[in-house]
Amino acid sequence: MINHYIKISPEVSEALANNRPVVALESTIIAHGMPYPQNVETALQVEDIIRKNGATPATIAIIDGQLRAGLSKDEIDYIGKLGQKVVKVSRRDLPFIVAKKMTGATTVASTMIIAEMAGIKIFATGGIGGVHRGAESSMDISADLQELANTNVVVVSAGAKAILDLKLTLEYLETHGIPVAGFGTDEFPAFYTRKSGLPVLYRVDTIIELAEMIYTKWQLGLNGGVLVANPIPDQAQVEFEYINEMIEKAVLIAEEKGINGKAITPFLLAKIEELTKGESLKANIQLVFNLSLIHI
C-alpha cells in the first residue's frame, strides 16, 4: 500500500535484501540543525563513518513529495543548501507535504516512521525532542516521544536536546513504557554534556547485551522503540554549568521574541551556537560522529 510513496536507494535496498546492518539518519539536522556548509560536510562524514564500520547509511528525507530512504551526495547538498527554507516535517505534516509534492526535512518522529516503512530498525540522531521547559503551561511536548512509544525502531542518541526539561522528558518516556538504556553510562546524557544529574534505570555495556534486550522486547510483543542514550565523548563535551547558563539565556531571548512551536528548537540551537562562539556546534558535530559508531 505504501510502496507507491517511498523510494529506497539501491545501496540501502541491497543491504536490506542481504540482511546487512542499515542505520537511518534524519535530515532536520542538515536543514535546521547546522549552518551550510558544515551541515553537508557533517552529514557526509557521518555516512562515511557508518560505511567504514560495516553498515549502510540511510539518510531520510522527503523530496518532491516522495519519501526517501537513502540520499545521494547531491541530494544531501540540495537539502543542506536550502537549509531552513526546507519544511521541518513531523508525523502531523507528512500527509500534507507528500500530497503537495513538497520537499521536507524529517524530524526524529517522521524519520522513525519512514525507517519502519523501509524495514530499517536502527536510527542514529544527535538528540531526541522531548518535553520543553514550561510545558506545564504551554503543553509543548515533541511528537518524537509519542513515536518512540508506537514505532518499532531503536533510536541511538546523546540523550534529549539540552534545551528541554530533561526530568519531565524522562517522566514522559516512563509513562509511555519506552525503555531507556544507558550505553556505558548510569546517567542520562544531556546532549552537549555527559551529565544531567538524572540516572538511567538500565545500563548496558556491550552491543550484544543491548541487542539481546531489544530482541527480547519485540519477541515479547511489546511494540514501540527503545531509546539508547550514548553520551558525547568526554573530550568533546561542553562544561555543564557553562552550557546550562547559555541555554537559559537563549530560552529567555526566545520568550522575549515570542518564538514557539516548530521554530523554537532551530532558534535555540542557533542562539546557543552564537552565545558559545561556536563551541556548541563543535560538540554537536562530535557527538553525531560518536553515535554513528553503534550498529546493532
Regions found by a protein language model. Name each.
Residues 1-52, 117:
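N-terminal glycine-/serine-/threonine-rich phosphate-binding loop
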Residues 27, 32-34, 39-96, 219-235, ...:
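Glycine-rich nucleotide/cofactor/substrate-binding loop typically near the N-terminus or early
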Residues 294-296:
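Conserved small/polar residues in nucleotide/adenosyl-binding loops
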Residues 14-17, 22-23, 52, 113-117, ...:
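Solvent-exposed alpha-helices and their adjacent loops that cap or buttress functional pockets
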Residues 23-25, 57-62, 104, 122-127, ...:
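General beta-strand structural signal in soluble alpha/beta enzymes
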Residues 194-219:
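Anionic-ligand binding region
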Residues 225-289:
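A C-terminal functional module that forms or caps the active site or interfaces directly
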